[in-house]
Amino acid sequence: LGFNLVLSWCLILYTLMLERTRSTSPPSDFKGKGKSETLGSALIGWSTGLIILSFAMTALIFITFPRFGLGFISLNTSYSPIAGFSDTVTLGDVGKIKQNPAVVMRVEYTQGGEIYKPDSQIIWRGVVLDHYNGRTWTSTLATEFETRNRPGTGLNLFRVSNPREVVQQNIFMESFNAPYLFTHGVPLFMDGNFIHVQMDKNFVFKTSDPRSGPRKYTLISDISDHDVSYSLDMPQNEPLLFPSRFLQLPDISSKTHDLADRLTQNARTDENRAQKILNHFADFKYTLEMENDPGKTALEHFLFQRKEGHCEYFASAMVVLLRSAGVPARLVNGFVGVEWNEWGNYLIIRQQHAHSWVEAYIPGKGWTVYDPTPPDPSLVTPNT
């Protein structure tokens, strides 16, 4: 505000001085007419009004910019890739991007037409990875479902037998080289400024449309935690039709297999096994500074020596232990949303919020989320 005041007055004085030098009327013409006081009052009033108006407009633009600017203005046109997000995950890569505060998405939540503020920790699902070669995770599932979206009409996706927490999410995504359409919860409906929509058997959504600027799309999702009845032509128990895909392991050490056996030896169900493996990481610590023993794989060094790492190590280790114990599991890469903007009432997701977690298939419950990573101090973000 102070800057606006000084700048405005400087511009006004400069204009007056400029007009004075341009004037051809002699100064005597203005003497004795009693206008100076009136002119000064009017000038002060008009300039003050303009300053107040400019400040109000600035505040309005600041608050509403995420709602309009990201959807329709070409931002970040260099299409730089998100360093912490790709369709593969290699141990150690996340450490380089967690300090990057660049904004990836802004998300507005509404429920029944009213502003909805979700819980502080929100996971935005991006890509699911099922194959591990000892260092890198990749996806081997082909596209299962492909259709054309008519912007303004949208697509009905899943249906939920007993919806309990249905919200609308308006997503404004920056330009970057990633075709994925991130989702939070079970997506029931999707619409956006894209035509082609694809989904694989891991329920990962993406578009093959060429990028022409920031992406804007709307989701209606059920963000409660319950079983899902699929509206797509896929049986409910399909994950069990190809369990080997989610039990695949590279050649890992007998020490790792022994750890999985020891942790789950008294567990009677897959849910118990998953919980016992999750509990094993309770005393591990979070760090971005990774060290590797040249004589061991990065994962073994993490499990048996260092016991410190970032989310990719925790998620990778849990999936490997689950699969060794016979529990189908997969690694998920996306973002965790923790930063809420109180001025504009929207969620901010930054590159430093990139995250990896685990989905394990539990009979009777389906794919269940487990996050073995301890809290990251950099993600404890106050409301802004």
Where is each model-derived feature located?
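Helix-boundary/low-complexity linker signature
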Residues: 1-384
